[in-house]
Amino acid sequence: MAEMEKEGRPPESKRSRKPAHPVKREINAEMKVPSNRPLPGAGQAGNLHGNSPYLMSFAENTMNELLGWYGYDKVELRDSDDIEIRNYPDGEMRQHISVLKENSLPKASTLENSSGSPPHANSSGSTPTSRNGVTAESSVNPSSSKEHGGLPIIVPLIPPPLIKAPAEEDSSNVQIMCAWCQKVGVKRYSLSMGSELKSFCSEKCFAACRRAYFKRNKLGYVRNCSAREEEGVPTHSLSKDTPRLVLKTNSDVLVCDWCKHIRHTKEYLDFGAGERRLQFCSAKCLNQYKMDIFYKETQAALPGGLCNPPLPTSDTKSESGAGVQLLTPESWSAPLSELRSRKAPSPVGATIAGPSGSTSGSPSEAGTVCSSSSSSSSSSSSTKIPTPRPHESPSLPPPHPPPISGLHPALGMPPGSPPMVMTPRGPVPFPIFMEHQMMQQMRPPFLRPPGPNSPHSNPMIPGIGPPPPPRTLCPPSSPMHRPLLSPHLHPSSTPTLSGNPPGIMPPHPAAHMPGLPFPPVNMMPSGPIPVPPIMNIGMPSLAPLVPPPTLLVPYPVIVPLPVPIPIPVPIPYNPQRSGDRPGNDGTLPNTANEQKDSKAPPSFSSRGEERDFQKAPPNSDTLSPEFSKQTEQGRTNMADLMVKMENSGKGSSEHSHKDTPADGVIDLTTSHRSRQQLVIQRAVTCVQVKAEPGLSPPPALLGETELDGSTSISTGTAKDDHRDTYSNAESPLASVALPCADPSYCSGTPPLSQPITCSASIIPSNITTAKTEPGSATPCNVIVNGSCNLPPTESLIRTPPLEQRPQVDTCRRTATVCDEPAGADLEGEDLKENSCLATEKDSAGKRCSNDQSAITTGTGDDKSQSPEDDPSGEDHAYALPLMPKPGCVIQPVPKPAEKTAAILPCGLTAPLTGTVPMEMEPPLKRRCLRIRNQNK
């Protein structure tokens, strides 16, 4: 090899490896040949697909050569030498020949020797060779001459000698065993390998074998060359002999009989003796082959019923099943005839009902079969039974799997005979099996509670009363039961034998009931009696039997247990509403009525208006954030009904601020929706009034209030009232609900009953409405929304009564706009008083006289502030922080006076009294105090 490579191989090998362009040229020339002369195979039958053999061989050769170039570099050396030896007297240019040629030449020689096909010419002018029915004579000569030119064109011209088209002599519909896949089929391809001609059923098998053959040839050629070189024989002289040598050496290189691969780096392992010797590339392949053989033999030996569960190899079952005993647990100690005779009925009929019926004659045998199948079947039939068992294991699965296989022996002990039981120790005699069955019978009493399921589990034992218990025991021992019961039942089975079976087993039955219920039922009647004898006899035998079940379980058995899984269901919950409800339990139902009555008024307050009003007054804006915060807090704490007054002393000054910014603090509605849409649906008994520091109305607000005129005075009064409310709320009534104690006040608020929107126009309109429609809303709930109160107050002051009228009208507030500021103020004061009284009643203990004095002090400030600020202040005094939106919306809803009062906090009255002159404040405060005292 080395010499050959040194001589001329490198350059020529390159040519042979890269003949792309030259090959194309040659191909073109060759393809043109038919036009000039008839194709070599023109007269012969069409190849493969009806194409001329010449063209077919050309294509096949080309493909083969390509495979050689890219897949087998060194194959070209050997092939080229062989081909050139035959084609050329001198071996100089032989190396140019492509791998395909090389393969074809050795194949040709083999064909000559083995198939008797016409010998392929060894010389360049060889007689036409019939390969695939193609004559390569003409092509060989020109190709050889061209090869000297360095173009290995011959490859396409030489049809692969290995392939014989089905159309050829061999192609007749001859049934052959494929040399590759070992399947019987029509002969489609043949390949000469060494001294034998191999036939293939398909192109796929042929290609795989050819590849392996190439590898062998390459390896053999290398070996031969190395041997010859060592001997000192010149390569040229060897060249002619090389093909034969190569073939011989190829015979040494074998394809692994299991994986069908050629592994040059590994030494093959020989297996078998005589004519048929198998070679395997590794111990793994050898072991797999042995396992396959063993499996096939076992299946063949097993009776039909037993063989069914095992595996697809059942094809071979019939072959060796009848009289051949294989190395199986059953064959060790039990005659196959017995197994077959017993199992023959059981697999079919006894599988379901047969187990009881077929084994009824020999319950002990049936039990042994079951036990053996349970113990040994876990290994063999575990694949089949375990699969169903995981699902069925709780109840019927164990018994059903045995029916599937026929009897338990069939499932778990394909090889074992009924008398022989497979255990961790090994096959157990039938008597031991009987003992094991006895143990199983002992189990049934324990399993009796599960018994109801026994009919299911007893599908195998349905007919046999006492025998069934053994089978029931068998199911437990069977892989299906073993997973569940083996840990408990087997340990308990031993105690059972000792005399504790009932004690131990009952717990297990409970635990095992899902899986074993069927055995207990049948076994309970017969099981309890046999248990003591079985316990004594079976103790030793059971010990071996019990462990196997645990060992035999190949698959984990999943026992479905119903476990309640809590599914969280989100329930919409509004803390504000809930807070209002607990505090307003008495008033809530009324509030609902009020809501119904005042559903129209809620539309009065438009948050947009309230917001606009808030924006207008700077002081109100400054205070509104605080108030909004308070309102938000109030929402969260509505249930608590906490009036958040940081300082009762601050209540007056802060309250005036809040009155401005926190006008909406008086949120009697639990939610924004109630504010907007409904008059206070829920009497906000929980009025959380939080006096925020700095509530004292800024001078600017006071100035605004003064500018507004009478409204500013009323606002001041309202603020004073609110301050009182805040102080009271802060002290005793911080957490007290503020329902209207006096219906009269609520009725007094009827002008307020019309909801006052936060918008300035709305609030004045509310005041006016109070005047015009004191009776329009009988009991009224005044809802003051958070910070909105300030803007409404401003609107009261700033907005002309005419503007207020349309707003009031839109809000369903019938009120003459504050055309008469004085009159409107007075009416507003009245409304304030009413609302204050109502709120005072609501907040009775919540607001102290000190708070009222503080409110009075703040009232002057509030007056100086814009009337909007004042209402907001008032809202703070009486307002619940519950409503987050700024602006005080007083939505009077006709309803019971108590409810209305509860809904109307003093803060509400404050916005109403925003128009009340300052003079009115002291009396209003007094009234509020009185109401509060009454509530207390």
From Swiss-Prot:
Biased composition (Pro residues): 395-404
Biased segments, Basic and acidic residues type: 1-14
A Pfam family matched in the record: SOBP
Keywords of this entry: Metal-binding, Repeat, Zinc, Zinc-finger
BP term (GO), one: animal organ development
Ranges where the record places region Disordered: 1-46, 108-151, 311-330, 336-424, 486-511, 574-632, 697-727, 842-877
ZnF start-end (FCS-type): 169-207, 247-287
Regions of compositional bias (Low complexity) in chain numbering: 349-382
InterPro entries: RAI2/SOBP
Ranges of biased composition (kind: Polar residues): 108-144, 617-632, 708-717, 850-859
Summary of the function given for this chain in its UniProt record: Implicated in development of the cochlea.
Family: Belongs to the SOBP family.
Name of the protein in question: Sine oculis-binding protein homolog A
Organism: Danio rerio (Zebrafish)
